[in-house]
Structure formats: C-alpha cells, structure tokens
Amino acid sequence: MSAERSFSKEVGLLRLGEGEEFHGEGILAVTKALLQSGVAYVGGYQGAPVSHLLDVLLDAEELMNEMGVHVETGANEAAAAAMLGASINYPLRGAVGWKSIVGTNVAADALSNLASPGVVGGALIISGEDYGEGASIIQERTLSMAMKSSMWLVDPRPNLSSIVDTVENAFELSEVSNTPIIMQLRIRACHVQGRFIAKNNKRPLINTRARQKDPAPFEYAKLAHPPVTF
C-alpha cells in the first residue's frame, strides 16, 4: 500500500533519543509519542485530518520492524477498532486512528464490545476532529460517543509538548482505569509545526519479534453478557 503523502525524510526523527530535540509536524509527533509509550500495534482507517498517521507508519516500516510493532490498515473504522480487542486480555498497548464522529459511528459496535469488558493493556483511539473553520460541513463532535460508551476523552492543546504528554498519559490512564481512551486531534494539532524534547523509544515486551508463547487465561468475567452484567 502506497502512502498518500511521503514522510520518507521526516521519519528519521522517530529515532531521536533521550534529550534530543524533535522539530516537526504534529502527526509525526504523535507517532513518536506512540513509540516512546511502548505501543505494540497500530492501525486505523484513513480520513482527514489524521490520514497522515498511517502515511508516517508506512514510511517508517523499517523502524516498526526493528521495534516489533505491528502495523495494519483497516478496511473500515470498525475493523480498526476491533484490533484494540487484543488489549482486552493481553498487556499490549495499542492505538488506532480515524476521522471524527463519522468514523467513530462506524466503529460503535466494536467500541461498545471493547469498553464493556475493559482493557488490561492501554487502548488509544486517535480521532481526527474536523469541525469548525476550514473543516468539513459536519459540525458534530466525538464527545457524545465517548459518553455513550463511558470512555475517557482527552483534548490536547495544539502544541507538540502537550500532544506528546497527552499520548503518554493516555496510555497510563487507560491501564489504571481499564478503559479505552479517545484522544481528539483537531486540524491545527495535526498539522502544527513545533518542537519538544524526545525520549527513548520503548520496545513492547510482547511484539512481533518476541511473541508470547501461551494464550492469555480465559476470564469469564470479561464476557459482556448475563449473568456477569447483572
């Protein structure tokens, strides 16, 4: 699959280590934050303004293979959301991205079945919000979908330090609360240019190069149906 836009030069920034200064675009900083957080798998369905998240991942194929990070493009938002099911029973940090409320609506079924049993590994949904000036005609927001499924929604300020901190903190919040997190990224946040001090990338303990030998133990309480839900 070819990228919509090439980040072949910029992906070198994803290798920056502790104390080095990152200078680049917002969506590239999100990818760096995912790697710094020890993400094990990333997926999504392309849609503005977060289409370039997958473009960055595809151009960074060599680094993703080195880190053991699984990257997958979904046939739609529902397929992308279903990927996060890996974090229900396994201590894997995963992230997926798609377009705003319309994409979240397509993923509603999968998200309900993700939020009800909860997650043990951090699960992050990156929602590209495009309401307001210079955006699409759709003015609805993803907050209502987050409320429907009792999921946290975080909204970073449009500067790289805030965005990176939000990604890292979102994974921690997801794990301690056993709840998927939605992070909304508006147009300005996706394309803003800025800088932040980088950290070392973290290789996930379970990855494509170090697979878990045995399946996770079956936990009946995580099945979202009676009598567990009584």
Predicted regions and their residues:
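Short beta-strand segments at enzyme active-site cores
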Residues: G43-G44, G94-G97, I181-L185
